[in-house]
């Protein structure tokens, strides 16, 4: 006879990893591309939107990106398809609201995000380029600083002041 606890653990873990899909309610928005959710399995998860990067706190449009994401997903039920983890262990996910609305598209269309620095997704790159051509959001600037460059600059500044 199989151990009931072992079977329960297998069933619960399959809910999280089967197809890498999490379903739950967004409990907080950390920044323009990061949020926390309480999944239906009662575990909390920190999720970063896969394939985009929004301005960092301290950069122009960071607060607007955060507020835009809050309006779209805070306290709403979402489905998150986990794509993997970044080098810091953060879960990267594709989020759908009501099964069809992808907040990455809205952030890119409004000019509030860049596509990923490495291996950009062509669909997202196309949306970003349209926003750039129209001069939306951060693309009003001649040469806005991408968040990955900003983070590196901040790290160097901190190292120099230490």
Q: What kind of feature is each model-predicted range?
A:
Residues 2-5, 14-162:
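Small beta-barrel nucleic-acid-binding modules, primarily SNase/OB-fold domains
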Residues 10-11:
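Short, linear, compositionally biased motifs with a strong N-terminal bias
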